[in-house]
């Protein structure tokens, strides 16, 4: 029970840290650039991505987070986060991760393996989402600049 409580704290702290990091990143990169509809669309893509993670966890497959990142996974990555979207996911993720750890509770080596999988998932998610967000935002800015140049009258 004490080990599960410690694991719950680890997961909760990691998810809260991830939520804070991504909320700061989203406000810095998205704030002021997009209107409410565009931010809502980004939030929907975020929920879709997190739903995919939750489904993988429900299938008791933590190794998916240790595998090389495939193009299909990148295609589902959200272009930004809001604190609300990830915090609404945290309860589902925490419950699923605790079930994974409970499955390995008989073997300390396996429990540690699951904890490392969780850490890898959170670290990889933070890195991929941040990098993908920055790349996507740069592409959007370039497209907007090109459209603006195309609309300007030529002298």
Predicted ranges, named:
Residues 1-84:
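N-terminal low-complexity or simple alpha-helical regulatory segments
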Residues 3, 65-155:
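Long, amphipathic alpha-helical coupling/dimerization segments that relay conformational signals between
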């Amino acid at each position: 029970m004490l080990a599960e409580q410690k694991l719950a704290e680890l997961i909760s702290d990691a998810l809260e840290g991830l939520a804070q990091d991504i909320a700061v990143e989203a406000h810095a990169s998205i704030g002021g650039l997009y209107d409410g509809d565009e931010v809502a669309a980004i939030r929907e893509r975020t929920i879709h991505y997190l739903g995919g993670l939750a489904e993988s966890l429900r299938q008791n497959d933590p190794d998916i987070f240790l595998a090389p990142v495939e193009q299909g996974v990148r295609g589902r990555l959200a272009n930004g986060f809001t604190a609300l979207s990830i915090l609404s996911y945290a309860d589902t993720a925490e419950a699923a991760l605790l079930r994974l750890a409970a499955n390995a509770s008989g073997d300390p080596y396996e429990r540690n393996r699951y904890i490392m999988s969780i850490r890898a998932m959170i670290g990889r998610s933070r890195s991929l989402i941040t990098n993908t967000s920055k790349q996507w935002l740069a592409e959007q800015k370039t497209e907007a600049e090109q459209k603006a140049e195309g609309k300007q009258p030529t002298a």
